[in-house]
Amino acid sequence: MKHEDTILAAVAGFVDTLSFVALFGLFTAHVTGNFVLIGAGAAGFGQGILLKLSVFPAFVCGVVASSLIARAFSGRPAWQGTRALHAVQAVLLLGFCAAGVWASPVTQSDSLPVLLAGIVGTFAMGIQNAHPRVIARAGVPNTVMTGNVTQAILDVVDLLSAGTPDSVRTAARARFAKMWPAIVAFALGATAGALGFRYLGFWALLAPAVALAGLAACAGMSAGTVAREHA
């Protein structure tokens, strides 16, 4: 799907920011930030160290589940595995939404509803992190923007440098064209996630769940269109 990475980047930014502001600084879309927060918590800074520790196995389980789902569809067209992964992640985000509503108002980081919300949300984002690794496709990373921003800056330097060879400039232009929509989408998704939680609470998670359900539906529709064009 043409804009799949852009939509997924917005989903990641939305979910990661919502979980951060709602669940004591928890990052659900990646584990790097949680390692930092666990270290800070071990030294007596911050709170929610049990929550951060509990979501790491959930992230691992999400990656494993993604791999198992992809293996189950290994003998079929790639879009079927993609549709399954998007659908499973959408269901998990609905579970995150339900657990978050149950946990509200969030006051204790080690309460069962809060732990469950963090675990389900991180499980969902573990699936998204593993998705492009278990089903090969052309695209850009959509859950963590550090590498994308770094590459985009390097490409801009190449594009603006007078001595850049034409072949390097062409490659840089093509990469930048792929990178910047995901970067902008992640930033917009992050803003929307924070605002969504402020005004809607955990109900705001319905938005990324619907977006993923749409991607799941479009995976089959796009494949059907291509098949008809080649018929």
Residue locations for each model-derived region?
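Alpha-helical transmembrane segments of multi-pass membrane proteins
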Residues: M1-A231
